[in-house]
Swiss-Prot record:
The protein's name: 3-keto-steroid reductase/17-beta-hydroxysteroid dehydrogenase 7
Pfam families referenced in this protein's UniProt entry, alphabetically: adh_short
Extracellular-facing ranges: 1-229
Membrane-spanning segments: 230-250
Gene giving rise to this polypeptide: HSD17B7
InterPro entries: 3KSR/17beta-HSD, HSD17B7/Erg27, NAD(P)-bd_dom_sf, SDR_fam
Length: 341
């Protein structure tokens, strides 16, 4: 029986590279591409099937920044599948990133220069906005949309006799200092991306605490700095090209520069092949590349505690309850309006 793997954000960047690597290693998989843009998804699906004709590749349309879309996709997936073996929670955004030139300049002459380039700490701020669901866009896209997807797909994921995996695309930029339980949507801050990635780390830990006994396991991985649409939002492609000689030199000292999406998937692919129950839920798995271009995996203990993770999980459950009530009221009003016409 084919393993079924669902990948959000599968039409480009890390998600697309992940599809290619997984099928290159096992073309008997059933990959389900969860994408917002159907035309891109269909092109990717056709290309994957052309190169791996024995594989099974399907598409489901989902926009994790729109909860109605998440609910529709979840309903469709439950009609299609009996179980899901793995979900890669990979889709994410970093809107309107602004490079802090002053911090970059001073960082170049500090002892933390390698750390700065590895984590982008203090280098980036982002804009954010409110979605149609009334939530902060980065939080909804990177965290809450995926949380609702997991909640909706629990019947396909929880099988104690044969464990399922959740694998999050996290980041080295996830920092405790940018996250607050009182403002977990980061509506008052300027680093929503870092906050959202710390939130996914917390959520992963809480999911293990609440679902391991039901056969569901969660882990987080960081792809490093790979050149994708996300990094091209920070600097245009031609600037990255100009910087490449310096970056290649820097890679001898900072292994976070994976540079290509293929390299960036190293830890994500490795996790898929492990027994999830054997992995430490408090560890983040990092894709790394040496100065000579060899890929390997590093581990990093996450800077968090399980009590905070559980408190955050409970806040998400409360928000979910509120959202469901709001959606139900909206649907009821729409039905009443329709019956009056």
């Amino acid at each position: 029986m084919r393993k079924v793997v669902l990948i959000t954000g599968a039409s480009s960047g890390i998600g697309l590279a992940l599809c290619k690597r997984l099928l290159a290693e096992d073309d008997e998989l059933h990959l389900c591409l969860a994408c917002r843009n159907m035309s891109k998804a269909e092109a990717v699906c056709a290309a994957l099937l052309a190169s791996h004709p024995t594989a099974e590749v399907t598409i489901v349309q989902v926009d994790v920044s729109n909860l109605q879309s998440v609910f529709r996709a979840s309903k469709e997936l439950k009609q299609r599948f009996q179980r899901l073996d793995c979900i890669y929670l990979n889709a994410g955004i970093m809107p309107n990133p602004q490079l802090n030139i002053k911090a970059l300049f001073f960082g170049l002459f500090s002892r933390k220069v390698i750390h700065m380039f590895s984590t982008a700490e203090g280098l980036l701020t982002q804009g954010d906005k409110i979605t149609a669901d009334g939530l902060q866009e980065v939080f909804e896209t990177n965290v809450f949309g995926h949380f609702i997807l997991i909640r909706e797909l629990e019947p396909l994921l929880c099988h104690s006799d044969n464990p399922s995996q959740l694998i999050w695309t996290s980041s080295r930029s996830a920092r405790k200092s940018n996250f607050s339980l009182e403002d977990f949507q980061h509506s008052k801050g300027k680093e929503p991306y870092s906050s959202s990635k710390y939130a996914t780390d917390l959520l992963s830990v809480a999911l293990n605490r609440n679902f391991n006994q039901q056969g569901l396991y969660s882990n987080v991985a960081c792809p490093g700095t790979a050149l994708t649409n996300l990094t091209y939002g920070i600097l245009p492609p031609f600037i990255w090209t100009l910087l490449m000689p310096a970056i290649l030199l820097l890679r001898f000292f900072a292994n976070a520069f994976t540079l290509t999406p293929y390299n960036g998937t190293e830890a994500l692919v490795w996790l898929f092949h492990q027994k999830p129950e054997s992995l430490n839920p408090l560890i983040k798995y990092l894709s790394a590349t040496t100065g000579f271009g060899r890929n390997y995996i590093m581990t990093q203990k996450m800077d968090l505690d399980e009590d905070t993770a559980e408190k955050f999980y409970q806040k998400l459950l409360e928000l979910e309850k509120h959202i469901r009530v709001t959606i139900q009221k909206t649907d009821n009003q729409a039905r009443l309006s329709g019956s009056c016409l």
